[in-house]
Regions:
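Acidic, Ser/Thr/Gly/Pro-rich intrinsically disordered interaction regions
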Residues: 2-41, 48-196
Length: 196
């Protein structure tokens, strides 16, 4: 009988040691989790505002726009629809440019949100979240590797805090833009000249 080869699996965590060490690292862990939670909360609120952009571009009601929004099952598909409808419906270059900018800003934030939602989190022996590893394959030099690893250091936490601030600004800018988009589209609405 041949010897069994060594396991290729990572060693499981020492759960008892982590549980014992967890209280001492709770503040740091809570800080990281609060940043991630705030980012996801802000991102979701901003994505939902695109329902109103769709409502205006489709010249429909809120429920119908939400149905279209929910039927498209990826953020990219939703933003693509917004951009295509804008090309068909928005004639004012300033309004179109502002919408393009809002979509671009949201898309940049979507990458960070996806990175944090679709990763493995590494904790050290004290229970501190030290790294993230993306849950996707990357090709480098013709070789596939499993997801990029990034530290959860002070610079990364500052990046998250800045992204949250940007989401706050984006939220205000989206709310400010919606009435301008509505006014532009109302001005372009064809006049019904059919007999009564």
């Amino acid at each position: 009988m041949s010897a069994r080869p060594p396991s290729r699996l990572p060693r499981p965590p020492d759960f008892e040691a982590l549980a014992a060490a967890a209280p001492a690292s709770a503040d740091r862990r809570t800080e990281v989790l609060a940043l991630i939670g705030h980012l996801v909360f802000s991102w979701s609120n901003n994505e939902s505002l695109f329902i109103y952009v769709l409502m205006l571009l489709l010249d429909t009601d809120e429920v119908s726009a939400a149905i279209v929004f929910a039927t498209l099952n990826t953020t990219r598909a939703r933003l693509d629809l917004v951009q295509r409808l804008a090309k068909a419906k928005v004639a004012d270059r300033a309004v179109a440019g502002e919408l393009d900018d809002l979509v671009a800003r949201f898309s940049r934030q979507t990458k960070l949100r996806n990175d944090l939602n679709h990763c493995m989190y590494t904790v050290d022996a004290e229970g501190v979240i030290t790294h993230t590893q993306l849950m996707k394959l990357e090709e480098r030099g013709g070789r596939l590797s499993f997801g990029r690893v990034r530290g959860m250091d002070a610079a990364r936490r500052a990046e998250l805090a800045e992204a949250i601030r940007e989401h706050g600004a984006l939220n205000r800018d989206l709310w400010s833009f919606l009435p301008r988009l509505e006014a532009h589209l109302v001005d372009r609405r064809p006049v019904d000249r059919s007999p009564a």
